Structures are given as C-alpha cells and as structure tokens.
Amino acid sequence: MDAVNAFNQELFSLMDMKPPISRAKMILITKAAIKAIKLYKHVVQIVEKFIKKCKPEYKVPGLYVIDSIVRQSRHQFGTDKDVFGPRFSKNITATFQYLYLCPSEDKSKIVRVLNLWQKNGVFKIEIIQPLLDMAAGTSNAAPGAENVTNNEGSPPPPVKVSSELPQAPTNSMPAVPQLPSSDAFAAVAQLFQTTQGQQLQQILQTFQQPPKPQSPALDSAVMAQVQAITAQLKTAPTQPPEQKTAFDKKLLDRFDYDDEPEAVEDSKKEDAVAVATTALATAAPPVPAAATPAVAPAVPASSATSPPPPQAPFGYPGDGMQQPAYTQHQNVDQFQPRMMALQQDSMQHQVPLPPNGQMPGFGLLSAPPPFPPMPQPGMPQPGMPQPGMPQPGLSQPGLPQPGMPQPGMPQPGMPQPGMPQPGLPQPGLPQPGMPQPGMPQPGMPQPGMPQPGMPPTPPVQPTFQPTFQPQNEPHSQKPHQQEMEVEQPCVTEVKRHVPESRKSRSRSPKRRRSRSGSRSRRSRHRRSRSRSRDRRRHSPRSRSQERRDREKERERRQKGLPQIKSETASVCSTTLWVGQLDKRTTQQDVASLLEEFGPIESINMIPPRGCAYIVMVHRQDAYRALQKLSRGNYKVNQKSIKIAWALNKGIKADFKQYWDVELGVTYIPWDKVKAEELESFCEGGMLDSDTLNPDWKGIPKKPENEVAQNGGAEASHTEPVSPIPKPVPVPVPALPVPAPITVPPPQVPPHQPGPPVVGALQPPAFTPPLGIPPPGFGPGVPPPPPPPPPFLRPGFNPMHLPPGFLPPGPPPPITPPVSIPPPHTPPISIPNLVSGARGNAESADSAKMYGSAGPPAAPTSLPTPPVTQPVSLLGTQGVAPGPVIGLQAPSTGLLGARPGLIPLQRPPGMPPPHLQRFPMMPPRPMPPHMMHRGPPPGPGGFAMPPPHGMKGPFPPHGPFVRPGGMPGLGGPGPGPGGSEDRDGRQQQPQQQQQQQQQQQQQQQQQQQQPPPQQSQTQQQPAPSQQPAPAQQQPQQFRNDNRQQFNSGRDQERFGRRSFGSRVENDRERYGSRSDERDNSNRERREWGRRSPERDRHRDLEERSRRSSGHRDRDRDSRDRESRREKEESRGKEKHEVADRAGGNKAVEAPLSQVGNTDTVSELNKGEAMATVVKPEESPAEATSSVEPEKDSGSAAEAPR
C-alpha cells in the first residue's frame, strides 16, 4: 500500500500545480502508478476519483494520467499483460462523462487523446466510438455534422463505417502494395486498407465516374454523404491516421503536458485533416472506379484516415474540407489527373508543387496540394481549421482535396482547399448550386486562419516535410503533413514572425529527426497550435507582442526560471536536494555528479539521512542538473539517487508556505516582503529580477547579481588572491631607478599604478617579455626590469635599499645598464624581487647581512635591474654603467648575502628568455627556478647552499637563482660545488692541479677560519653565483657582467661552500660528500676536460635546476629559518672574515689562477680591492674562486 499511497499523493499533488502540467510531473505520476501495479485496481480507482473530484481545468490532466499510465504499461509489459487498460475501460464511460465537464477549449484535447488511442489500438473502437460520439454531442460542430448526414439519409452508413474502422485497424495495412510505391502512397494504402479507406476509394471512384458536368444535385447528395461521414469521422476517423504506435518513446512525449497542451491537440487535428486530404488525393488516382453512392458514407472512413475530422465536432473545419473536394465532382476528372501528377511529384518529393507552391514532401503524396497554406486570400486554409471554430458541415477547410488546385493554381473542378465549395463558385471549380452547408464562404476566412500570404509559408513547411518523408511510417509522415498544414495556418503569422516560426520549425525538424515522429510532431504542433490558439484568444494583441512574449518565456525556461506570478516576487532556489545516497558517499562523489552542470557553491552532506544539499552558483545549472538527473537512473556509489529542488537557506520559516517544490521557487507576494529583506532571500537561491516590484528594482539588482553569480563573491575573492601572487612578479619594474619606475607603470599597467612600489600587490598584470619594452615605454627607454619574481613579497620595495646600503645610485646609471642589460638586466632585477618575494623576513635578513657585508655583497648578489641603484652604491667604484646592474646593492640586500639565498648574480642585461623568471611572461619558458626538475639539492642539502651560483659565462639566470639553484653555486645542484659542476667545467690540467692544490689549502684554511670565509661569502654572495663563468671567460664577465665580485669572493665562496652551514665541519662534511661523489674519480680528469663552452651549457642547466631547487628551498620556511640562523652566524663571522681576509685572499688568488691564470692575477688585484669590490675583477675572481673552492674542497676531502 505504500506504493499506492505514494501514487495517491503524487497524483493529487497535481492540484497544487497550475495546469499545463509538466511532462516531468506526468512521468513521476506514471512511475508511481507502475510501481503500484500489483494494486492496479487501487491505482485505477484513485485516478477515476481524481477525475471525478478535480476542478474542470484538471480534467484533461487526469485524462493524460490515464493515457500515460496505460501507454507505459502496454509498452513495458506488453499489450497482453497490460492490466491498466482493461481496468480503466470498465468504467471509462462514466469517467469520460466527468472529463467532458472540462472547459470547452479542452474538449479538443480529449478528442485528440481518443483519436490517438484509436490509432494505436489502446482501446477497442467499440469503446472509443461512443466516447467520441459523446464529445460530438457536447460540441456544436458535431450536431451540425450529424444533421448533414441525416439530411443525406446516410447517417447509418457513416456509423457503420466508424464501426468498420475498428474492425480494420489502421495498424493492419496489407493493401499498401496496391498503391504506387512511395512512402506517401504506402501511408495512403494503409489508410485505404481500412474499411473506411475502402469507402473513401469508392467515393473517389464515384466522383471520377461523373463527368465534370455532373448535376449539382448529385454533387449535393455526395456532399451530404461526405459531410455525414466527416461528422462520424470527427467522432473517430482521426484515429487511423495516427496508427503509429510509439510506446517505445517516452510515452508522455506524445502529449504535451507542458504549457501548451491545447496546441498539440489542435495540431493533431490539423494533421489528421491534412493526412486525410493527402490520402484522398493520393488514393483517388489509385482507387478503382467502383464508387457507389452508398460509399459516400464510407467517406467518414476516408476522413478517418485523416484523424482530424473527429475533432471536427469541435468545430474543426478540416472535417468538412473533404466534402468540398467531393462536391467538386465535376472537376474531379480534371482533378484526378492533376492529383496523379501531384502524387507523382510528391512521390518524387518535388517539394515545390508548382500550383500550390507547397512542397509536395509535406503530404508525402500530393499532400502538398492539400496543404491549404496556399489557399486564396480570404479562403480558410484547409487543414488550418481553427480549433474552437466549429464548422458544422464544413468539410472543406481541414481536408484539402487531393488534386485540389493550390491557391493560385485553382484547378477547374478542383475545390480549393480551405475554399468553401458550397455556394462559393471556385474559380475554375464552379459548383452550380452546390453550396456546402456550413462551408466557410470564400470571403469568410476562418478565424485564426491566416488567409493571405499563406503561400509563402508553405515552403518553409515543405522543407520540414522532406525531413519527415524519409520516415517510412505512413503515420509519421501523415502527421508530418498534418504538422505542415497546422503550421501553415500560422504561415501568415510566420510571415509576421518569420524568425520565430522559422525557429520553431527549424527546431522541430531537428527534434523530429532525433525523436519519434509523433513526439516531434507534437512539439512542433504544440508550437504552431499554441500560436493559433493565442490568435484566437488574443486576436487584438499584436502577433509581434505574442512572439516577444513567447521568446521571453522560452528564454526564461532555458534559464530554469519558473512562471511569473503577478505582484509576486520569485525567489528561485539554486539549491538541490540529492537523496538516497549511500552513507559512504563523499562530497567528492556528489561534486563529481553535479559539477558537469556548472560551478558548485557549496555541498552540505548529511550522511545519517543519506542526503546532501548542493548549492549551485547558477539557477540554470541547477535546473539542468535537476532535469537530467531526475529522468535517468543515475547512481552514486552504485546506489540510485533522487534529486529535487530544495528550499534555499535564505527563505525564512515565515515564507516557507510560499515554497513550490516542483518549480523550485518561493513565490512571495510583494506585500509580504520588504525590499531590504530581499537580499537575505538570495542565500542558496536568486531573485528573479522580472518579478520584482518596480519600486524595489534598484535594491534587488544587487542581491540578484550576487545570487545569480553565487560564485561571484568567490570569484572576486579568488581574483584578489590571484592578483596578489601575480602582482608580486609585477613589482620588479619598480626595481629600476626612478626613471625606470616611471616607465614601469605600463608594465604593471593593469594593477600597478606606481610600479615603483614593488611592495604593492600587483594584480595579475604581467610585464611583456623582458626583451620587449612594455607598452608604455618609448623605444629609447630601457625596458623596465622584469616583474618581480612570484616570490617577491608584495610589500617589497625594490627601491628601498637594505639598511646597510647606500641609496640607489643616480638614474644615469640606469641608462648604461639599459645598454648593458640587453639580455641580462631583467634577470638580475628579478633576483632582487626574489628576495622580496620571499618575504619581508628575508629582506630583513638580507638587510642585516648587507649591513654586515657591506655594499660589496650587494653588488655581488644582485647586479641587474637594480643596477641603477647599485650604481650609486658602486658608483664609486666606477662600476656604475655596466656593473651598476651587477652591483645592485639593493637587490643583494634583499636577497642579502643570505645564506639561503643565492645572491643572484647575473651578468647585467636582460636575462635570456629561458632565464627570465616571470612565469607569466608569455614568451619565456618557465624560469628554471620555477621548474622542479633540478637534481636533488647538492651536497649542502637544503642548508645554505654556497652563494656562488652563477658561473660567469652563462647567460644570466632566471631572475633569481635560488641558493643552490645555480649550477655554479656550491648549492645543492650540480654546481661549482656540486659534482656536476665539476663535470661541466673543463679546466686545463694546470688549472685542475692548481685548483686541487688550492682546494686543499683552502679547506685547511676554511677549517681554521670558517667564520671569515662565511663572512666573506656573505659579503660576496652574488659573485658566488658566477664562479664558473669567471673561469670560463673571466675577462668577459669582468668587463661588464661580473665586475661586482670582490677579490675576497673566492674565500667567501668557500665560506659559503659549507652548503648552508658555515661551520667548517659542515663544510667538510658536505664538501667531502660532494667531492667524494663528484670528484672521487672525476676531479682532475673532469676539470681538465671542461671547456668554457661546456661549462656554460652545464651551468645553465644546473643553474636552472638548482634555481628551481633553491627556490623551493628558499620558500620553505625551514630553509629560511636555517638561512637566518646562518646569516646571523655569518654576521658574527664577518669580522673574523675581515681579519682573515688576507689569508683567504692569498688562497683565493691561487684558486683563481687555477680557474684561469688571467683570473688569478686579477683576483690578486681583487683581493686588494676586496673592500672596494671592483665589478670587473670580482666576477672573474668569483668564478674562479668558486670553482677552485669546490675543487680544493673536494680534492682535500677526497683523499680523506
């Protein structure tokens, strides 16, 4: 009984909905009924009770429930095992008596359902016929038709015909072969196989027999018979045309349970009429000439072939259409040849019937002629009978007679479809004294039927028809024809609203193609019918207004917005309830189910209840998710789920009474809510702006936007966040001296008003590739330095030198750097930024270091963009122009001689693209440091890698080489200190020997004087990066790139070489590790092998690797801490370093000699000038010193 109770609740919940009932609701009711099939008697009784008790507007939905249940049951269990159909049929008469209490405009829908049942054999004709008669009795048109038949005295034959129709179900159509081979003819043949069809054939033959001059009396008699038949057909004939049983498809699709149910019915009627006319036209030629007057009654059968007639009782003009054709017997002879030609044309799918201008494809046969779209102006369009326009004897309109001259192509003796045959002499079709009773007068366009201008529209339909014709099912084809006709009525409308009608048509064809003909037909008809219905109801309204309304409504439906209620605010929920979840289901499972539909704002899991509440960002996404997931059997963790709208959080308890769970909307009357409360309603939902009180309009917009973009807030948050990181890179431009600063704004343009302030977070504006001047810069202006590296702290001000440094040099130096920078300057600036990015802590540390180290360190570490600044620092030393970049004290200060940071010492100038460090720079590959592909940290581990990172010869590094990032660094990568470095560098045997010797000496010294070395290292962190380059091409770097290295750099490097610990023990330990590993076999041999070129490449790679490694390390807070500690220790050791500088320098000189004899001499000089820090010498020294340092360490340790 639970299933029964569930069905009962589901069914009676219809009362809570406004009529047109949605297809989704029908499906739910049908499923509930099928689940309760074991108690099917209860289900049937519940439905009957509902129909009996419900309001008139719910009668037709009740009928749709019966239809849906029976069809689904027949489809699912088979016609033999279906229990619902027989059970409903037991009390169906009483049920239909209640059904006919529906509004008059809904009766056509009931007839349509009956016709479908007859066509598909859902119920026997014996059951359906009385129901159709009942409908006829209730409709005005039916009585008129009956009168006509009575006049003829052939009413009984029609009745017989109707009874016969059931006997010869339209489903059985063996006679098809008799007709010419074509889909159209096949359909017609099937129709004719029925008894009614045979009668129609006879009638056609009868028409053929009489010559054109047939007496009007005969015509009138025939017409009377035809009318009688049509009246009967109105009751049941429509059924045959729709023989197609398509239970396979969503059975509910046939009916629109949607907003426009009426339209569907109308369309079906029209379709039936069209089919009948086409069938008649096609059949006429094939029909043997054995027509009997008595056959005339059979005409109803023919009309039956065109299901629309049954609807005629409702004033469906189409029914009478056939009659007019018959009335024009005189023309029949001429008419038939034309019909034949038309049929052939249609068979050939010659879409344009020249006469009609209609596409033959519609009718499948010569149906095109039947299409009234071509009716003469003022003549009702056949097949376009307006529902609600009962035309009691009018048979002409709905059924264009086959062979009937298309409008503009009146065929003599051929009734114009939609042209009243009865007292309307048709041009070329004079029917003397044969006015059709109830036939619309030619001058009487049928209401709702576009008269003139119809012809143009037909072509549109034809295009669709062909798509249908391919379908072999005669019924589907007929329906298509009917559809075409139906739409034709809208042709005038189409003209006016060409876009819409075309849209609907073009859309419907697609639907037809993809779905069963019946459904597509319905949808198309629904549209066209609804249009005609609208015309009837709102004739005064402009069609353009209707079209706009329809389009707006369609857009709203697509957005998932519910119907608008007057003076009611709609708060549309974007919250979905998903139930029957397995308790093991996780948020990720639910998110994966719904994220395909759109962004999810939040997911609230309630495992004990096995459900979740999902708030989607957009209503449309939630609507699509609900539509899709509610139809299929979707599973999460192998368990089927349920999904429904959930009341959004913003709705307070007071307003829950207004919640509509079916539509997922809370309709709150304007007078119940205050404008200021609206915003609070948006949580988990959105306001429908179209439903807001104009007085509030301003207020809601805000909430609405927020709601509509429930993710909006998130997005904004996200943006700010991302900008911050991005800005970090941007700041670099600020590094340049003030002049550059002015220029930089363009780089940072989007977010950084003043590039100078590196610290300010810069939105995600990225500077163009460094090589290209930013948009704002003139060609002559040096490009601003590259944006700060991502790690640069937003607040970092490149212009601000560390405490120990002089203020930035005068701008002039900048210009020289500009010339120098071509490739390198930006990278250098980046290093500064790097330090900044690391954070203020780093900058502070670096500042400490700088204070202790003094300017020399700065020049060493950051030569590039800050060059302008460094110039001032180094300006004294004359390094200003070229070296200025190299000398950037500020950058050094930022990075500091930080143990952890590799003083990024890059040759001045823009870094090569591969070295440039802005991940966002489009042109550049990810900067090496950014990539985590570097070898594991070198001997130093993550500890403070030796600062010497860069070997002089290679192109500058990514803006910042991380400690250990530079191959040359003693840091973790292969570098001068690393094993790979050794391999990379080819030194001449002499150099190797010297280096080894020096290394040994240095190691000893280091052990003795670790602090001084460390301090020196601090002072000259940058040079350490460039050791290799110096060896390779010491002079080159001396000239411009590495001029900043101090003579004491070698020792400093060695001091640093301890790899993160300045203690000699550590150094020995790390050094031995690296030396043993790298140097054990390779020391001399590898050094000897190395050539500057090889070193250069190796260094680049190593640098990139290390920089990546170092970068990561630096970022690591632990690394920073260790660096800080080391820095502090260095600060202490700096004094010692100064004391021991002499000894170290002595050592360094030999080392430099090892690297290069030239370097050695310069190193000696450098040593003397260590305090001064000459850029030229320092680079050479640094490079040479670094390598010797490593070599010596390794040599000394290896023996150990």
UniProtKB/Swiss-Prot annotation:
It is found in: Nucleus. One of its GO terms (cellular component) is nucleus. PROSITE patterns: CID, RRM. Residues 462-471, 986-1036 have a biased composition (Low complexity). Gene3D superfamilies: 1.25.40.90, 3.30.70.330. Residues 367-390, 399-461, 856-868, 927-958 have a biased composition (Pro residues). Anti-terminator protein required to prevent early mRNA termination during transcription. Together with SCAF8, acts by suppressing the use of early, alternative poly(A) sites, thereby preventing the accumulation of non-functional truncated proteins. Mechanistically, associates with the phosphorylated C-terminal heptapeptide repeat domain (CTD) of the largest RNA polymerase II subunit (POLR2A), and subsequently binds nascent RNA upstream of early polyadenylation sites to prevent premature mRNA transcript cleavage and polyadenylation. This is SR-related and CTD-associated factor 4. It comes from Rattus norvegicus. The gene is Scaf4.
